[in-house]
Amino acid sequence: MNDKITLVTAFFQLGRGEWNSFKRTNDDYFNYFDFWARIKNDMIIYTDKVSAQKIEEIRIKKYNRKNTKIIIIDDYRKIDEDLYNSIKSATENGFNTEFRINPSTPESWNYDYNYLMLLKEWCVKDSVEKGLAKGIIAWIDFGYNHGGKYYTKSQEFDFEWKWKFSDKIHLFTVNKLDDLPIFEIIRSVNSYIQGGVIVAPDKLWLKLWNLVRENMLTLNKVGFSDDDQTILLMTYRQNKELFELHESDSWFSVIADYSNQKFTIKKCNAKKKKQKLSKKLIVKYLIKWFSILNNIEIKW
């Protein structure tokens, strides 16, 4: 395979700065993007009218990356209204949120968030269909690296990311895969596959979009909704022949792991952090359900 990689990303304003938890402002995201936006690869960016000017200022005017195409979407909800309404209905049923150990996570309660996370594959598929991207294409989250969480020197992104990926869909894992049922993964908020970077040849992005869309709708039909990480895991389990998995020791290490560029990084063990967090959440979850069960009148 050719080592050239086209990048696709997206940013839509979700009002995340007003959330009670997992709060990040629009300016936070623009700063995150600014950290890696000088990368020299061809880039297609999907966004809304309000954000387009700021993105252009960063990518094109500040870093002079004219190999950039900005696609404006007036209303992201209208991209796939059936999918949006399905996710909304499942998210709002009450049980979808209460079922989880940590109901404050955005995938537990925010249907716009879950919908937008799934549109990653749609954006790349759309880029291919419009003739804007070909060959190996990588989705990369707009907020990749969170402004210095892993990579510490922005100037080290002044390079073109190249790597000879095979003719498969490449997913990157932060925890070892097991056979835990999907419902338990949703309940325990476990993470296996990261959604921040996905790499695949152009010919497989339409198939991937159709598969993740179908799996989200299937999950919605049984009363649940979740973000793209769980949906990607479902898709992998059903279609292993399409995929190649790669272990990562951080949510953001992919570009460092699969390029010849030298980066200055912070070491972060995602696995240990997740395990410590889960113990605290499990205790809270047990207390909550013990209280609920104590108030249920049982009739024999």
List each language-model region with its residue ranges.
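GT-A fold catalytic core of metal-dependent nucleotide-sugar glycosyltransferases
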Residues: 112, 116-171
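N-terminal anchoring/stem segment of glycosyltransferases
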Residues: 1-106, 115, 119, 127-133
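Short beta-strand-to-loop element that shapes/binds the nucleotide-sugar donor at the catalytic cleft/hinge
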Residues: 169-182
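Short, well-ordered beta-to-alpha junction loops that form the rim of enzyme active sites
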Residues: 48-49, 140-144, 248
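Membrane-proximal basic amphipathic "stem/tether" segments
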Residues: 261-300
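A structural signal for well-ordered alpha-helical segments within the folded catalytic domains
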Residues: 27-30, 118-122, 203, 226-230
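Catalytic core and acceptor-binding pocket of nucleotide-sugar-dependent glycosyltransferases
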Residues: 146-150, 186-271
